């Protein structure tokens, strides 16, 4: 895999001005983004998140998942901390693409859960890969991470690439009546680390 750095610009947001660093995977043509806020020493553990693209949740305000809520909360947490990063990876639908994601949603509307829907379409439950994060983190001078995630696969992916995960920071937000079953499936079948308190908290309903 060859990841080329392209350019950096400012990105004003409701939580402050981030820097947006663009990267291109020369093998797939996919474009990935690193958002950074503040400055740091490479030897310090930096608050960050690996976030896979979710058009429906991030841009269209879908309540079927927790992705948009997690992205906004991660950006707010980083701004409040004064420093941090988000790697925004173009891996829509856990790696199956937007149109296949819509096909999977159609199956879910008929009763399948998120894992069953992927498998009925001939995909694994999670098709994402994380090889691209190593050169992206190298460019933004991150070697140790306080990782905002509920997903153990992301923790392992970083560790396998030699990146120190100094701390896992839970990101349990966005539960509502439309996504509660989806979140439970992620917990029971994909191993996402979510507390019972998250499922018992009715504030998002």
Swiss-Prot record:
Q: Which residues bind Zn(2+)?
A: 54, 65, 67
Q: What is this protein called?
A: GTP cyclohydrolase-2
Q: Where is the active site?
A: 126, 128
Q: Among its keywords, does the record have Nucleotide-binding?
A: yes
Which Pfam families does this one have? GTP_cyclohydro2
Free-text function comment from the UniProt entry: Catalyzes the conversion of GTP to 2,5-diamino-6-ribosylamino-4(3H)-pyrimidinone 5'-phosphate (DARP), formate and pyrophosphate.
Give the coiled coil ranges: none
**Cofactor notes:** Binds 1 zinc ion per subunit.
The EC number(s) given in the record are 3.5.4.25
Please name the InterPro entries in this protein's record: GTP_cyclohydro_II, RibA, RibA-like_sf
Q: SUPFAM superfamilies from the xrefs?
A: RibA-like (SSF142695)
Q: Can you tell me which family this protein belongs to?
A: Belongs to the GTP cyclohydrolase II family.
Cofactors required: Zn(2+)
* A GO CC term assigned to this protein in UniProt: cytosol
Gene Ontology molecular-function annotations? GTP binding; GTP cyclohydrolase II activity; zinc ion binding
Keyword set, alphabetical order:
GTP-binding, Hydrolase, Metal-binding, Nucleotide-binding, Riboflavin biosynthesis, Zinc
One GO BP on record is: riboflavin biosynthetic process
Binding site residues for GTP: 49-53, 70, 92-94, 114, 149, 154
Question: Which organism does this record belong to?
Answer: Shewanella denitrificans (strain OS217 / ATCC BAA-1090 / DSM 15013)
Pathway involvement of the protein, from the record: Cofactor biosynthesis; riboflavin biosynthesis; 5-amino-6-(D-ribitylamino)uracil from GTP: step 1/4
Reactions the enzyme catalyzes: GTP + 4 H2O = 2,5-diamino-6-hydroxy-4-(5-phosphoribosylamino)-pyrimidine + formate + 2 phosphate + 3 H(+)
**Keyword set includes ATP-binding:** no
What enzyme class is recorded for this protein?
hydrolase
């Amino acid at each position: 895999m060859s990841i080329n750095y392209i350019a950096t610009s400012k990105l004003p947001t409701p939580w402050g001005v981030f820097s947006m660093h663009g990267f291109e995977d020369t093998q797939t043509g996919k474009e990935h983004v690193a958002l950074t806020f503040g400055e740091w020493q490479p030897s310090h553990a930096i608050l960050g998140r690996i976030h896979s693209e979710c058009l429906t949740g991030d841009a269209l305000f879908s309540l079927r998942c927790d992705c948009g809520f997690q992205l906004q909360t991660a950006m707010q947490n980083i701004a409040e901390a004064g420093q941090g990063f988000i790697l925004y990876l173009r891996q829509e639908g856990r790696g199956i693409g937007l149109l296949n994601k819509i096909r999977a949603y159609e199956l879910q509307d008929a009763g399948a859960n998120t894992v069953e829907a992927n498998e009925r379409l001939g995909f694994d439950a999670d098709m994402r890969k994380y090889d691209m994060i190593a050169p992206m983190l190298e460019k933004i001078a991150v070697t140790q991470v306080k990782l905002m995630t509920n997903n153990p696969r992301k923790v392992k992916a970083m560790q396998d690439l030699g990146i120190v995960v100094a701390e896992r920071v839970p990101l349990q937000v966005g539960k509502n009546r439309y996504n509660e079953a989806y979140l439970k499936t992620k917990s029971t079948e994909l191993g996402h680390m979510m507390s019972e308190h998250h499922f018992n908290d009715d504030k998002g309903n």
